[in-house]
UniProtKB/Swiss-Prot annotation:
This is Cell division topological specificity factor 1. Prevents the cell division inhibition by proteins MinC and MinD at internal division sites while permitting inhibition at polar sites. This ensures cell division at the proper site by restricting the formation of a division septum at the midpoint of the long axis of the cell. Belongs to the MinE family. It comes from Syntrophomonas wolfei subsp. wolfei (strain DSM 2245B / Goettingen). Transmembrane segments: none annotated. It holds the Pfam family MinE. Keywords: Cell cycle, Cell division. HAMAP family: MinE. The lineage of its organism: Bacteria, Bacillati, Bacillota, Clostridia, Eubacteriales. GO terms for biological process: cell division; regulation of division septum assembly. It comes from the Bacteria. The gene is minE1.
Length: 81
């Protein structure tokens, strides 16, 4: 987990790369995870990321459902240096 966070928040000269790194997709099997849990995950992910980097604008958050699976797709715009 720490390695993942180091890659996500590593110094980068490209704002586009940072935005791409922060596009998070969590997939789960709907039979074991409720919509309320997905909302909680979304809120907590945004909270954790905002502790480490400054967010610019409004994050785009989508819950995508396909068959038995759902995905939480988060696109977070970061403030430039």
């Amino acid at each position: 987990m720490l390695d993942f966070l180091k890659r996500v928040f590593a110094d980068s000269s490209s704002r586009k790369q940072a935005n791409d790194r922060l596009r998070v997709v969590l997939t789960h099997d709907r039979t074991g995870t409720s919509s309320r849990l997905m909302e909680t995950l979304k809120e907590e992910i945004l909270e954790v990321i905002s502790r480490h980097v400054e967010i610019e604008g409004r994050p785009e958050v989508k819950i995508i459902r396909e068959g038995r699976h759902s995905a939480l797709d988060i696109n977070i715009p970061l403030k430039g240096r």
